């Protein structure tokens, strides 16, 4: 919406709050007088997406541009590192290098994993998060997380996978996590969440393998004074069956 002061100076409704309802030209108080002529001019404009330098080729009418940019699939991603609010943003190749070089996150090529988590004094860990590994699988990147937190008053551990890309593309993949010992095991299968979702949002939705602390310590064996968990898993791509139209798994070795 385009507004103007009593002297005819114009500015947009977004900027009105930034100038504290005062015209930046004449300092008169701004009302809600719309400049319809300028709005008509704005409606006729077609502008490219501001993320064109990242690959977006779309062109939009002026008033649709901001709405598109808020959801543009080429918009930069926030750093997915868990455990700190890292302010870095960028495309996927940049963030993979950033995670490796600045956060010292391990990177591996392959779609299967086998991790062992060892923590002394696990009863003292109420809120902790670890981004353990970034996997390069099927030409895409995935982040494996492991967290300790409370559900109500119950201490739990949780493992989950995030996809370094958009939500729609994440739906093409599935993953499994498994933990166990002494002839018992827990399993989880699901779809990785996009890194568009903050890791806390994923954690708080309980979208992953959740292990109660007493079960985790049972799996650890011994005197239950040390956490020793082995978590294995794999990632696969759901492919369309050309004959029956049914999704069949394509498992990367």
Annotate each PLM feature.
Residues 1-253:
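Signature of small Cys/His-rich zinc-finger-like modules used by ubiquitin/SUMO E3 ligases
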């Amino acid at each position: 919406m385009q507004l103007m002061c009593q002297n005819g100076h114009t500015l947009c409704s977004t900027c009105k709050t930034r100038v504290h309802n005062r015209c930046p030209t004449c300092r008169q108080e701004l009302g809600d007088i719309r400049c319809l002529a300028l709005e008509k001019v704005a409606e006729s404009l077609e502008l490219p997406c501001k993320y064109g330098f990242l690959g977006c080729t779309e062109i939009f009418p002026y008033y649709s541009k901001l709405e598109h940019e808020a959801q543009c699939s080429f918009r930069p991603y926030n750093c997915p590192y868990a455990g700190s609010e890292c302010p870095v943003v960028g495309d996927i190749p940049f963030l993979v290098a950033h995670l490796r070089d600045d956060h010292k996150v391990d990177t591996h090529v392959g779609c299967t994993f086998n991790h062992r988590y060892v923590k002394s004094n696990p009863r003292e860990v109420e809120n902790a998060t670890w981004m353990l590994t970034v996997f390069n699988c099927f030409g895409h990147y995935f982040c494996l997380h492991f967290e300790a937190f409370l559900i109500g008053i119950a201490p739990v551990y949780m493992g989950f996978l995030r996809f370094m890309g958009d939500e729609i593309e994440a739906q093409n993949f599935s993953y499994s996590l498994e933990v166990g010992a002494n002839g018992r095991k827990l399993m989880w299968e699901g779809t990785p969440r996009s890194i568009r979702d903050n890791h806390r949002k994923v954690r708080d939705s309980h979208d992953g393998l959740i292990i109660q602390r007493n079960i985790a310590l049972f799996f650890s064996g011994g005197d239950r004074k040390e956490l020793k968990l082995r978590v294995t898993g794999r990632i696969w791509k759901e492919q369309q069956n050309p004959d029956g139209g049914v999704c069949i798994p394509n498992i990367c070795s």
